[in-house]
Amino acid sequence: MVAKVLDGLAVSAGIFERLHRACCELENNGVCPKLATVLVGNNPASRSYVLSKHRDCKNIGIQSTLIELPANTSEKELISKVEILNASSDVSGIIVQLPLPESIDQNKVIEAINPDKDADGLHPLNLGYLVTGKQGIVPCTPAGIVKLLEAHRITLEGKTIAVIGRGTTVGRPLGILLSGKGVNATVINIHSRSRNISGLSRIADVVVACAGVKHIVEPSWIKPGAVVVDVGINQSGVSSSGKMILTGDVHPLTKNIASYISPVVGGVGPMTRAMLMSNVINLSERDFRKRLYAS
């Protein structure tokens, strides 16, 4: 058995079409959605990802602006830039590209973003809404994973799902999202201090690997027919043509055991970008409704 592909490119294309129509409707009502991205330093992977986000904006019709800051930018200076964007009436959504230099407290910067402009959905208030089940802005990658599985008609309700990794951008919010009333799955959150990791993973109907460790999930960790979602993107050198070699958290031979598996390129990545664009549109629509009711 060779696993079927969870095609994030195909699913995201449909989402982008819907978002383009929504953007046109907003513009017809005098609203121009705009995303502001802050990039600190010159990390090649971060720069590439930021540019792809801005291409998505252009294709959908969302305005975008990129604020580039040097790697030696202080935490105070970065937060000051964020506060300027918070006060800008023409900015619908804000993202600060992660990771940040070690000298900057990532959490403080995220907390400085206005929750009503938090396009990444990582502000503590929006994460709190996720915990309580209140409608809010959901972190992009967790939302994208659920959409990807739903698009392939994979039932999640009542299923056991192993989430390998407990980071604040994917693992933790994904576990909350999956166990909430909207999805109703049973979640096992596996991390570096978990015991019998392979055994816990092997009982899961769905395994989501978001540990950020190359090929940590071995074929022996997967029960036959399970669904595998590979979130990991690890840089493993450069090819002879000069292209970056990317590997996932899941060993390639896992495809011979799983029923479905997401590719490292064209799997979760496009879905994350689609959910970011969706968040920007949602924030714009929310702001439009507020202004409409206030008038």
Curated annotation (Swiss-Prot):
Catalytic activity, as annotated: (6R)-5,10-methylene-5,6,7,8-tetrahydrofolate + NADP(+) = (6R)-5,10-methenyltetrahydrofolate + NADPH; (6R)-5,10-methenyltetrahydrofolate + H2O = (6R)-10-formyltetrahydrofolate + H(+)
SUPFAM superfamilies per the UniProt record, alphabetical: Aminoacid dehydrogenase-like, N-terminal domain, NAD(P)-binding Rossmann-fold domains
Gene3D superfamilies: Leucine Dehydrogenase, chain A, domain 1 (3.40.50.10860), NAD(P)-binding Rossmann-like Domain (3.40.50.720)
EC code(s) of this entry: 1.5.1.5, 3.5.4.9
GO cellular component: cytosol
Family: Belongs to the tetrahydrofolate dehydrogenase/cyclohydrolase family.
Subunit architecture: Homodimer.
The protein, known as: Bifunctional protein FolD
Upper taxonomic lineage: Bacteria, Bacillati, Actinomycetota, Actinomycetes, Micrococcales
